[in-house]
Design a protein with these regions (language model features):
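Short, well-formed alpha-helical segments that are part of the catalytic scaffolds
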Residues: 7-26
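Conserved donor nucleotide-binding strand/loop of the catalytic core
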Residues: 42-71
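Cell-envelope/extracellular polymer assembly enzymes that use nucleotide-activated donors
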Residues: 3-5, 29
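Short, structured coil segments at secondary-structure junctions
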Residues: 26, 48-49, 128
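Short aromatic/hydrophobic "clamp" motif used to bind/position activated sugar donors
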Residues: 77
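Catalytic-site signature of metal-activated, phosphate-bearing donor transferases
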Residues: 63, 69, 87-185
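Acidic helix N-cap motif at the loop->helix transition within catalytic regions
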Residues: 15-18, 39-48, 89
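A conserved acidic beta->alpha catalytic loop
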Residues: 23, 34-44, 57, 81
Length: 185
């Protein structure tokens, strides 16, 4: 049976971390790679029995993501931001895909629905964000906000036609103007 590691990089991520971790509670392994948070992030991760690792703050998350993925021990890796929730339908899809992957399709793009200031932003719906792959098959470059590079095989777009209801990541981006101001600083 194929196993799934979830990798989440955090920095002062207490706002949604309980919900994020609850959404992947069935994972075989949850790795939280923290960049020395100063809020309740670590306490929340401990309550969810995550494997906790620390990485220095580098200015971009990609370096820490690569390092965190090296700590994963399962067959497949799902990378999440600390403000992304996996729907039950997506989790079931990923578990099934890990058991029966499409031939030579070793990395998957997942649809992502974004909420900004509490409202769904329909025009920001992406056809997919590459976040699920066989362990060791993808890595991030040192460029911020770039998709990871696939080493072997081709990429697969999950639910590209949108026919599968609720098979998506839910991204709660910038919940308030106050939060937006904090992010700018």
């Amino acid at each position: 049976m194929a196993t799934i590691s979830v990798v989440i990089n955090t920095l002062n991520a207490q706002r949604l971390l309980d919900d994020v971790l609850e959404s992947v509670k069935e994972a075989d392994e949850i790795i939280v790679c923290d960049m020395h948070s100063e809020d309740e992030t670590i306490e929340i991760a401990k309550r969810h029995k995550c494997k906790i690792f620390y990485h220095e703050r580098t200015g971009i998350v990609e370096l820490a993501r690569n390092w965190a993925m090296e700590q994963a021990t399962c067959d497949w890796i799902l990378v999440l931001d600390a403000d992304e929730i996996v729907t039950p339908e997506l989790w079931q899809y990923l578990k099934n895909y890990a058991q029966h992957p499409k031939k030579n399709r070793n990395a998957c793009y997942i649809p992502r629905e974004t909420y900004l200031l509490g409202k769904h932003v329909h025009s920001w719906r992406q056809s997919g964000i590459k976040r699920f792959w066989k362990r060791g098959n993808c890595y991030y470059t040192n460029e911020i906000h770039k998709m990871p590079v696939t080493r072997e095989g081709k990429d697969f777009w999950i639910n590209k036609n949108g026919k599968l209801k609720n098979v998506a990541l839910i991204h709660y981006h910038i919940p308030s103007l106050n939060h937006f101001g904090v992010r700018l600083n």
